[in-house]
Curated annotation (Swiss-Prot):
GO molecular function, one term: acyl carrier activity
Species for this entry: Azotobacter vinelandii (strain DJ / ATCC BAA-1303)
Compartments where located: Cytoplasm
Protein name: Malonate decarboxylase acyl carrier protein
Biological classification of the source: Bacteria, Pseudomonadati, Pseudomonadota, Gammaproteobacteria, Pseudomonadales
Major location (coarse): cytoplasm
Name of the gene: mdcC
Length: 99
């Protein structure tokens, strides 16, 4: 198991929380809650050691040129593919954006 932390610029805090997926279904759970203004904090707990670069590249592609809401994101991963990770993150971001 490995724990990774990432931080990206963000806008104002989201107004609600979101939970999508679960570790037993699709091997991934994403939890979002409002965070401090201007910061998107992501913590990944993964069963795949040595995957920090893959995660960093995925997040950089997702947030390049965008200003996501300020969030604290917890991701619990048990070997999900990058496509599943992106899908779950997009679902969670859509959920916190719909107020």
């Amino acid at each position: 198991m490995e724990t990774l932390s990432f931080e990206f610029p963000a806008g104002q805090p989201a107004r609600q929380r979101a939970q999508v997926g679960c570790v037993g279904s699709g091997d991934l759970e994403v939890l979002l809650e409002p965070g401090p203004a201007g910061r998107l904090n992501i913590q990944v707990v993964t069963s795949v050691n040595g995957s920090a670069e893959r995660w960093r590249h995925l997040f950089e592609r997702m947030f390049a040129g965008a200003e996501p809401p300020a969030l604290n994101v917890d991701i619990h991963d048990f070997g999900a593919t990058p496509g599943v990770v992106r899908l779950r993150l997009e679902q969670a971001l859509e959920e916190v954006s719909n107020v």
